[in-house]
């Protein structure tokens, strides 16, 4: 590409580093949580019949977690990690095939999770496209702080994740990532 001194520089949204909030993360941002520095590697969102929920993929060395933010009466944050569906105590895909829903109670590593809700939604990877439809079943432990989710993406594709409800004050040093100029 030839150099052109008269071309307009790409205009990027300026970010006030003193006004960066957990609910407004973008790819490239870094933040501290649980004695680790995490980088936001992606920003996805879900649509549950008009209710939006944001999800950020956070990476630290070889670990990946997902921070989901939903807004009802304020922001609720959930931090989750993917697990293999086969780690759960029941053969979930077969159970759903026979009963249309997973069991009301799931035991995982000594913790009992009770069914709380189910939703049909659309997932927008990187916030783009028409979205992929899925069904999610959400569970909570007795304290209602730990979560388990089962997602069905097709007749034979299931995913599971374990998580916990977190508070925004548990995250610190939220900084915008380096801005690179397009050439």
In which residue ranges do the predicted regions lie?
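Mixed-charge, low-complexity intrinsically disordered regions
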Residues: 1-183
């Amino acid at each position: 590409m030839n150099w052109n001194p008269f071309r307009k520089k790409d205009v990027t949204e300026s970010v006030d580093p003193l006004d960066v909030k957990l609910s407004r993360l973008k790819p490239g941002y870094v933040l501290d949580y649980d004695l680790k520095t995490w980088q936001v590697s992606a920003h996805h969102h879900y649509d549950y019949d008009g209710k939006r929920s944001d999800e950020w993929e956070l990476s630290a060395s070889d670990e990946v977690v997902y921070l989901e933010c939903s807004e009802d009466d304020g922001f609720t944050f959930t931090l989750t990690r993917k697990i293999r569906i086969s780690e759960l105590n029941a053969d979930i895909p077969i159970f759903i095939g026979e009963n249309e829903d997973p069991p009301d109670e799931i035991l995982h590593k000594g913790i009992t999770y009770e069914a709380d809700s189910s939703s049909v939604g659309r997932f927008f990877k990187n916030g783009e496209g028409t979205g992929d439809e899925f069904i999610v079943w959400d569970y909570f432990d007795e304290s209602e702080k730990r979560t388990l989710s089962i997602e069905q993406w097709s007749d034979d594709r299931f995913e599971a994740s374990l998580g916990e409800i977190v508070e925004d004050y548990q995250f610190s040093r939220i900084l915008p990532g380096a801005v690179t100029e397009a050439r």
